[in-house]
UniProtKB/Swiss-Prot annotation:
Cellular compartment(s): Cellular thylakoid membrane
GO terms for MF: ATP binding; proton-transporting ATP synthase activity, rotational mechanism
Protein name, per record: ATP synthase gamma chain
Extent of the signal sequence: none
The species this protein was found in: Picosynechococcus sp. (strain ATCC 27264 / PCC 7002 / PR-6)
UniProt xrefs under SUPFAM superfamilies: ATP synthase (F1-ATPase), gamma subunit
Protein family membership: Belongs to the ATPase gamma chain family.
Length: 314
């Protein structure tokens, strides 16, 4: 016969676990909102920066300009910037991006191209360092909602690697935020910058909304057509010098965007995982409660049978 006290203790344990998972789900939902607000708040700056870049680009013959960040060279070594999270309990978020990075590293090795990692997030750092992978720089313990200062620090390291020709190309491997239940690990070239592709034609922003008591994501296409500055605008400095100064800023902005998307993907994955855990806890509580009631009924029936048997014996 099942132990009633043991079942009762398990029910209480599952109840306590459900409280924790539900709290984590709500915290993740609140942080997803903050991540979305941050993406929205940085967009005006990004659009203005693109206006200036396009205007300068139209006034220069880029193939003749000395712009190190746009210069293509023979690729002998690739820097792989991998962005993961610091924590677990977020489904397959970290595992998927690490798998994507490993696959890309194998492709480069098969092509006879060297590579080295720049790792963002404790999960990536632990995984690749434990496997003695070539690592140039690591970043862990960043804010869960990324800041421009953090993106700038990482961008400075990438610029140093690229301009010193320690690497000839830098690729970004991060998770693109698609929806609360879906994320997409992607590989994107960061350096050298391609002036013809300063904007992503699939650029979108996302809004977290509540509908029918459940969280949903609304995505909105962002206009990628950038208006040029007035033709009669005069730049006091040489446009080439201005462009050389603005391109690192553009790189930092692109990196901040990737960090924000990665953070939103991680939080959404954690929210979904905790929601599933809460649902599973509810189902387990129902099963345990049913088992408890059956055990109680069996115990009562046995006691009655023993009383009746004792009475008959008299």
């Amino acid at each position: 016969m099942p132990n009633l006290k043991g079942i009762r203790d398990r029910i209480q344990s599952v109840k306590n676990t459900k409280k924790i998972t539900e709290a984590m789900r709500l915290v993740a939902a609140a942080k997803v909102r903050r991540a979305q607000e941050q993406v929205t708040s940085t967009r005006p700056f990004a659009n203005t920066l693109l206006q200036v870049l396009y205007s300068l680009k139209s006034r220069l013959r880029l193939e003749e300009a000395d712009l190190p960040l746009l210069k293509q060279r023979e690729v002998k070594c690739v820097g792989l910037l991998v962005i993961t999270g610091d924590r677990g309990l977020c489904g397959g978020y970290n595992a998927n991006i690490i798998r994507k990075a490993e696959r890309r590293a194998k492709e480069l090795a098969a092509a006879g191209i060297n590579y080295k990692f720049v790792l963002v997030g404790r999960k990536a750092v632990q995984y690749f360092q434990n496997r003695q992978a070539p690592v140039a720089k690591t970043y862990a313990g960043l804010e869960q909602i990324p800041s421009a200062a953090e993106a700038s620090d990482i961008a400075d390291e990438l610029l140093s690697l690229f301009l010193s020709e320690e690497v000839d190309k830098i690729e970004l491997i991060y998770t693109r935020f698609v929806s609360l239940i879906s994320s997409q690990p992607v590989v994107q070239t960061l350096l050298p910058l391609v002036p013809e592709a300063l904007t992503n034609p699939d650029d979108e922003t996302f809004n977290l909304i509540t509908r029918g008591g459940k969280f949903q994501v609304e995505r909105e296409k962002v206009a990628t057509e950038v208006k040029e500055l007035p033709a009669d605008m005069i730049f006091e400095q040489d446009p080439k010098d201005i462009l050389n100064a603005l391109l690192p800023l553009y790189l930092s902005n692109q990196l901040l965007r990737a960090l924000q998307e990665g953070a939103a993907s991680e939080l959404a994955a954690r929210m979904t995982a905790m929601n599933n855990a809460s649902d599973n806890a509810s189902d387990l509580m129902k099963t345990l409660t049913l088992s408890y009631n059956k055990a109680r009924q069996a115990a009562i029936t046995q006691e009655l049978s023993e009383v009746v048997a004792g009475a008959n014996a008299l």
